[in-house]
């Protein structure tokens, strides 16, 4: 066995002395899979070569939203050529439940179905066509029960998946009683389909001793590992999850990915053959949960100048038929019901309503967007009622730096950038001049009306379940100076792997092309937290940084011993390692370490310090820090049709010291457009019987390129490091930009309000579809006729 000899390469050393490392943190490196994505070379689960004997799975879904199952006859399925196995709940060897926190999510329906689209049976066959035909051949009979579909009705009937929860500060009733002005209202916020490009997919290969190799498109490999083990009745060490990349996630693969993996595992163990399940787009949209729709009621007390003195908000989330993650999601909506504003005395109540729809789940922002939309609606309502400028009102109520800086859940708002960001964006977007210009335009334009809004974002970063704020990483250095990297995060296109490679390159001072990242693997880094809550780079980046520092310190100690020098005389820079007067390439040092029996692998670990939250008391510090941003959006509406266009958007967003500005700007742009889609064109529709009607791209409209503002200006806050000890003082960027899209919705309300001379608030439900915009115009036009 031969290894590299530790000889110096003088030319390499001279060249690397001359130029700084080109690929560490702070540089706009391209996405590590960018070329593979555009060329089609990036392999997803469905691209893997088919193994001999591979079985394809297809589900048969419930045809009713609420019914008892009276008969299941799978005999006809076996008459279809190629059908090998049909699964019912009786074929589950372990626990027939995939609830992430509490039981209540049956893998296969037993005696009752709780929503239209619930999986009742699964057929395994030698081809996808045979599996589909087999699933359609089964005979399933029901006794139909009455479904509960409306969140307001569920709230009235106290139909909950979890008890209501309250955040309270001060005496809100007394504050409302003494307020010179009181404003009340209610409205609906729609849900949102994840619409990831790759639908829910899993491939399971059986091994010896009941071991299972699971390839799962999941944001949460450890949870899939745990649930597969429970469903199969085996231990977790017999299940290994492999996840190289997802074709999108957005939260929809945090808990929802486990079901298909578990079904494949049953078939693989039952038949001894590899099993794959890739849901069709229609089945995926019918089976899986969405962003939670919300019903919001509010009552606020306001001083003459618009200052909030008392706020009461009820947030009723439509959770679907089971808990899933709804407890934490509605909690986060409550945490963000203040957004950027000091509420005064406040009571925020969260309701987790149970309905006969798919169990709603995580989605980018995790409830935070719904909470923010509630308070932004309130701000616009106050501005119209009191005749105040919406931006001036918002700034009047911002959190302060020295006082008025405690949230309604009793966390201090630190490193507050709201004033600075708003002032900079107000100037760069020319807000005041455009506001005057738009009012003049609307006064002379009878049919087209323009609207403008500038809204802030203050988003808390951390899992609110504190134990999840931890991560691990594994780094291996080989004797040729190359590095293999594994961590507990998952790549879904957001650039996480690219950033973590840059972090390791920065610590070791080597180029990124020397680092190879491998699939997320529960056999390498165990007990991972989900890649969610904008924590991917914060947690896994810190763990990788820790592992790299351990290895660098080991190398440093070795060189100190070899050269009888102090650690301060050893430096890693630009691919060169200096020890006293001696200079080495990084590969030389790796070879020396091996020859001197220094271990060249290290496990890194990180946990977020200082966060805590007492849920019973409704107080604590659930967030490590806040990310800030603001967006200014201009729209134009057609008052005859309700159609509209986004004309311009100016965005200023805080990412701390950016790890990769190009990726961060991409996340801001994408998050903004996705947020705009949620609040404008993405409408979920159910029939009176509970059938999900918008179950494909023909009926469910995500933003197209024509929906993006023609003039989109994105700027990152410069020269502002995160004061917290995050990875190289960066800030999370996954979720906060999503809420920037609220500015578009507020701008639409501003345009509609102009029809009534800005004297009435249109209070549009979200999404603000052209139909809703037109109805708002007609209502205000009628109300305007009644004005004295």
Predicted regions, residues:
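C-terminal catalytic domains of large/alpha subunits in multi-subunit enzymes
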Residues: 2-6, 89-90, 233-238, 268-275, ...
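Short acidic, glycine/serine/threonine-rich loops at helix termini
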Residues: 96-101, 134-137, 216, 225-227, ...
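Flexible, low-hydrophobicity surface segments
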Residues: 1-164, 182-185, 270
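A glycine- and small-aliphatic-rich helix-loop capping segment at beta-alpha/alpha-beta transitions
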Residues: 220-221, 229-233, 256-267, 293, ...
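Helix-loop-helix junctions that connect adjacent transmembrane helices in secondary transporters/permeases
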Residues: 152-232, 398-482, 693-705, 711-715
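Thiamine diphosphate
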Residues: 247-272, 276-278, 496-504
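Glycine-rich loop/linker segments at domain edges
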Residues: 27, 32-40, 166-202, 293-378, ...
């Amino acid at each position: 066995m031969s290894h590299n000899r530790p000889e110096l390469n003088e030319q390499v050393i001279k060249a690397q002395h001359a130029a700084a490392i080109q690929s560490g943190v702070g540089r706009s490196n391209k996405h590590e899979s960018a070329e593979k994505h555009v060329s089609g070379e990036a392999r997803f689960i469905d691209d893997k070569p088919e193994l001999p004997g591979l079985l394809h799975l297809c589900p048969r879904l419930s045809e009713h939203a609420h019914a008892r199952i009276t008969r299941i006859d799978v005999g006809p399925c076996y008459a279809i050529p190629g059908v090998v196995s049909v699964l019912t709940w009786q074929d589950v060897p372990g626990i027939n439940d995939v609830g992430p926190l509490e039981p209540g999510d049956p893998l296969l329906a037993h005696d009752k179905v709780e929503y239209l689209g619930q999986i009742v049976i699964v057929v395994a066959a030698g081809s996808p066509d045979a599996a589909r035909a087999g699933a359609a051949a089964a005979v399933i009979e029901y006794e139909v029960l009455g479904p509960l579909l409306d969140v307001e009705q569920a709230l009235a009937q106290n139909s909950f998946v979890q008890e209501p929860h309250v955040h309270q500060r001060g005496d809100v009733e007394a504050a409302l009683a003494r307020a010179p002005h009181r404003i009340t209202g209610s409205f609906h916020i729609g849900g949102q389909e994840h619409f990831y490009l790759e639908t829910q997919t899993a491939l399971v290969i059986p091994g010896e001793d009941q071991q299972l190799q699971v390839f799962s498109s999941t944001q949460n490999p450890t949870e899939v590992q745990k649930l597969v083990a429970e469903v199969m009745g085996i231990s977790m060490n017999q299940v290994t999850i492999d996840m190289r990349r997802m074709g999108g996630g957005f939260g929809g693969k945090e808990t929802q990915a486990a079901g298909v993996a578990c079904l494949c595992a049953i078939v693989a163990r039952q038949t001894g053959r590899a099993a794959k399940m890739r849901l069709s787009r229609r089945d995926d949209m019918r089976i899986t949960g969405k962003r939670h729709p919300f019903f919001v009621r509010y009552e606020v007390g306001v001083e003459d100048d618009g200052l909030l003195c008392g706020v009461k908000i009820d947030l009723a989330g439509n959770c679907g038929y089971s808990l899933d993650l709804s407890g934490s999601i509605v909690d986060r909506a409550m945490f963000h019901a203040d957004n950027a504003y000091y509420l005064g005395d406040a009571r925020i109540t969260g309701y987790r309503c149970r309905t006969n729809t798919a169990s709603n789940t995580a989605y980018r922002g995790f409830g935070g967007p719904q909470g923010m939309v509630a308070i932004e609606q309130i701000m616009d309502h106050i501005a119209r009622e009191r005749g105040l400028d919406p931006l001036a009102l918002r700034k009047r109520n911002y959190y302060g730096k020295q006082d008025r800086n405690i949230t309604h859940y009793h966390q201090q708002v630190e490193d507050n950038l709201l004033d600075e960001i708003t002032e900079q964006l107000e100037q760069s977007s020319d807000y005041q001049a455009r506001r005057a210009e738009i009012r003049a335009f609307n006064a002379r334009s009878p049919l087209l009306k323009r609207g403008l809004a500038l809204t802030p974002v203050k988003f808390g970063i951390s899992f609110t379940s504190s134990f999840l704020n931890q991560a691990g990483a594994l780094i291996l250095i080989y004797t040729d100076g190359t590095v293999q990297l594994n961590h507990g995060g998952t790549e879904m296109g957001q650039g996480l792997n690219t950033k973590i490679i840059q972090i390791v390159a920065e610590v070791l001072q080597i180029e990124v092309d020397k680092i190879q990242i491998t699939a997320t693997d529960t056999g390498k880094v165990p007990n991972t937290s989900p890649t969610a809550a904008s924590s991917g780079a914060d947690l896994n980046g810190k763990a990788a940084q820790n592992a790299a520092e351990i290895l660098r310190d080991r190398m440093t100690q070795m060189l100190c011993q070899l050269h009888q020098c102090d650690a301060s005389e050893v430096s890693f820079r630009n691919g060169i390692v200096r020890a006293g007067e001696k200079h080495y390439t990084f590969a030389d040092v790796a070879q020396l370490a091996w020859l001197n029996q220094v271990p060249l692998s290290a496990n890194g670990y990180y946990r977020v310090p200082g966060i805590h939250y007492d849920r019973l008391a409704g107080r604590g510090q659930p967030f490590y820090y806040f990310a800030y941003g603001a967006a200014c959006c201009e729209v134009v509406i057609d008052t005859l049709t309700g159609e509209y266009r986004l004309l311009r958007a100016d965005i200023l967003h805080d990412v701390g010291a950016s790890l990769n500005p190009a990726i961060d700007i991409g996340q801001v742009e994408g998050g903004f457009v996705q947020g705009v889609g949620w609040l404008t064109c993405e409408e979920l529709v159910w029939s009176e019987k509970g059938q999900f009607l918008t179950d494909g791209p023909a009926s469910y409209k995500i933003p197209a390129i024509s929906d993006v503002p023609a003039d989109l200006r994105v700027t990152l806050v410069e020269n502002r490091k995160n004061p917290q000890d995050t990875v190289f003082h960066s800030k999370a960027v996954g979720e906060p930009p999503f809420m920037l899209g609220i500015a578009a919705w507020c701008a639409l309300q501003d345009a509609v309000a102009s029809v009534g001379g800005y004297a009435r608030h249109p209070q549009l439900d979200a999404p603000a579809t052209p139909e809703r915009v037109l109805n708002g115009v007609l209502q205000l036009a009628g109300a305007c006729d009644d004005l004295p």
